[in-house]
């Protein structure tokens, strides 16, 4: 909470969780994101299949607010953002926490309070600080392997950590992680009457294409529809295939008694792939086309059963930070640092076509890359003044300069180019009066079935442009958005009396692309006794729109009412979005209130903290504006004209337009309760009981109806459970540790505008069990299961589980079932 002076959890004026490496090791996950989800109930994390890049970099939330409202630090220094801007919802762009191997961590500090006045943009919901290991000796290696009870999703992770001395007074600590995970599928066959017919007219639709199904033609085409997955399901819903190699280092060298040089950084490479929506025979993408020789071509020649595009994402992440810290003779402490970081996503789309190119279309495309880069230089100082208070007054102050950029890199030509079939009669076979031209008569003479008088003839068929599922970034919309910012900040704190601690912070930050922001914070703790204290804070905060949110553009497949349509996202400051009413993005601003208490009652440690966050001018994507080439479709046709006039390639294949906007005001309020209690059983060992319980409620504080439809409004407030709890019992006896953990997810609801129906999801408990045994000083084994009772959330029943989907796949509840694992660790 206070710069320059560490404080314990119980005497901090704001709520802080500190998890040691032992705490992290007691969690069965190795992914740092999942570890946080397990330990911090106000940290929610879902899995989003068929969601473009969000399938590979999972956005999270803290205290009911998206991931970009939480500041991420490594060794108390700002972590760079990922290159992913989530297209829907809040358009969140935060750091990719999964690039930090859990074995590299000495501890994790979670500040559950606004801290923009101390750390700058993004620290609205809180701050997560990852502290790296700094041992100068020792070697540890572990291998973890497991599989879901459904028989899929096999995962293997190998981690290692090595500590070495650096000269006579330094260290270098190196961590590595290599992992591989197979895909899962929690789907039923995607089968509808218009493409999965039942010749007997009697079988239920869900067995028409099963092992005993009756549609032989559909079954015969399945192997070509979905490459790389179970060919019996044309559209799998589950986690993607994934593999990764990640490395982190942390180093320090004591130059003299008062001066230390330090550095840390990482390299991470990962690749994932998952499916998109199934294009069934008869879908608008799969149409008869009249080719240049007068013959008819249909994509079913390449894909007899239709096709499911396969989306690949290669994610590269790099960072390097160096600095020097120490103290001057006058007692002024300093810390000078510089950092650079970059995240890049390279996309590949396979098992698809550019429909407008007809028979000439390739089947695999490189639609382009996304790159986020940051460079920052910072100077921190702190000084203690003697005072008449119970402690010296600590003054911390400093300055920062940061450059940021976001680049959309052009895709390969065929991923975005408009082929001949983007326009009717591309080869000039027919006259305006619907008679054959000379070219038309020539192909008819050669045996073509061309009939210019028939409006249904394939010569007039128009199909979509670009690699279907994720059209490439064209030169027109491939650009680099850059900005810089400077900041000045100060923080003062002191124990006013033996019982009262007060802290104040002030920050001024100026951005090159919008006006400056000034934010403040006040916090305090009053200790009534050694065992009981109250604490609270009030502060203002802000989150600057990222260069990615301001500059990104994307056209991808969405499913607003159960059917795939191409949806275009355009920059709020660009001409297309502004023609529809958009204005350039401005910072989100916030006011945070927290009040709570800490208590130590006998062996019981208890903290209770109430909070409220008011967020003004929240960044959100508008509800999709329909687009149609039909002149009778009113506003939808006007939107098409705007796109077409702006020169958007393939405007005729776009079904909707959205953009980010500062749309409305929201609030997030709740309570966090954390408790622990140890039990000693003498010769029978000891048990530590812990509980972390979180309640969160979100609400709109201004009318969002101009930007969000009824379903989006309902889901924003109700989609995630209000209550979430984690209850853990860890029993140690001799060399054996037994851990039982129960995770609770409260009742919640979701709606579907296509059916105007709402579904209540019942409360759900997941139970994890694990046993660890220390074989000797070197080897330790562990085995157990997550969700051992194989619980699932309720199946969807309001019409938004189209296309073989059984569960609300965007839910924060896991829907993959039970997972069983074993782990071997060696410490040298």
Residue ranges of each PLM-predicted region?
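C-terminal beta-signal and adjacent terminal beta-strands/loops
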Residues: 615-616, 743-751, 772-828
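Short acidic/polar hinge/loop motifs at secondary-structure boundaries
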Residues: 77-112
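Outer-membrane beta-barrel transmembrane domain signature of Gram-negative proteins
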Residues: 299-301, 307-320, 329, 340, ...
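N-terminal periplasmic "start-of-domain" segments of outer-membrane beta-barrel proteins
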Residues: 1-27, 54, 83-89, 139
